[in-house]
From Swiss-Prot:
This is tRNA-guanine(15) transglycosylase. Belongs to the archaeosine tRNA-ribosyltransferase family. The gene is tgtA. One of its GO terms (molecular function) is pentosyltransferase activity. It comes from Methanosarcina acetivorans (strain ATCC 35395 / DSM 2834 / JCM 12185 / C2A). The active site is at D90 (nucleophile).
Amino acid sequence: MSAIFEILDKDAGGRIGKLRTPHGIVETPTVMPVINPNIQLISPKEMKSFGAEILITNSYIIYRKEELRTVALEKGLHGLLGFDGPIMTDSGSFQLSVYGSVEVTNEEILGFQQKIGSDIIVPLDIPTPPDVHFRRAEEELAVTAERLEAARKFIQGEQLLAGPVQGSTYPELREKAASRLRDLNFEVYPLGAVVPLMEAYRYAELVDVIAASKKGLSPTSPVHLFGAGHPMMFALAVSLGCDLFDSAAYALYAKDGRYITANGTYHLEKLNYLPCSCPVCSKYTADELRKAKNKEELLGKHNLYATFAEIRLIKQSIKDGKLLELVEQRCRAHPKLLDGLKRLYTHSAWLEQFDPATKGTYFYCGPESSFRPEVLRFEKRLDRFSLEGSAIIRTAPVKGEKDYDRVLTFKAPFGSFPAEMEEVYPFNAEVPKFPDYETLSTALSNTLKLMELNPGAEFTFICEKEFEHPLIEEIGKKAKLVYRAAWKKE
């Protein structure tokens, strides 16, 4: 199937898109609630009321249980689950990762998924866990590659075929695998065997795995982060270009009495108040929810409401050009997520190619903001500013500046730029009057680079007394340095 994914809006690596399937169009990014055919806390037909457009279930479980298999073959997957929207099916790879083996071949499970009418079919890949020896990861990747090549020949027609990207925690293997799969033209690309990283809060490594995989894929391909179900990390993953998530967390957490929010998880037993306004939390107090006979179901519903509320906020943030602001807010919910944010910005040079040239006002959220793609883009374009004669650089207008040939504004984290561009993106940024050390470092470094690129100009640099930084001394070697309080009023 060609042209199955259409990108509508972009911000950083994130995008809003339309994924076309045999049972309808899905708007991404979105979450696929996991449906266990044996145990359904919330029925599939109810899922649309929470915002679900697509579900995911395990074809291996259906295949292994005779009663389920018979109904699925007679009525189809959608008849079995009672859901008329798109359904993706996993192949049994999860069971393979847990138990070490499955009683089905790749060809058998592919054929079964095809017969029962799955919208997105997944081959039986090898989910290589993190931290294994490189040779094992390489060997298992070779087996996965053979199975995926066979699957691509086997599955033709309207049903979508997923090509899982494996490679353990080796970025070079992830990128190599993704590049190979790109040539096979799968319709969806899941990133597999990442659940252990998320369970261990190894978000920095997760970022590297996603980035490496994305670098090997076409930028127009839809990407599914397998097993990602907690909303606190959705924004981070979306900013890297993930489009689909799947969540069993809504049910698993409810069974354990855990209450999901976009900033983390609470234990219901310890809550005095419900910090949410979903239909469940608007109707019940924390104490009433604890005592409810259907507590698990109600908690599962809240978890779904919270999950899809975050997806909607992410989409609006993409529309507004504010995705990275949301990412920076969410990543302050946990120190390990903050590690993920810092690792994200080590990939800013790659992200910059996808980030729109103009968008909403840049808002400073913390020291990490100085490493965003738009700041890097400004640094790369410093050589476009050609300055001659006298040039004054100031943080705000000063008397006598009209006597200079060029007037520049200094604003962290960017640096110095022509004053007439102050209201132009990204220089209309909302930033603190007194920047932190890292942000000031970036701005002063860029200003020094601008001075070095324009040796024929004679610079005067006026700044605040509070700008205490070693690079101020370097600025003083290339310009007349004056603190604002000492600037001679004219």
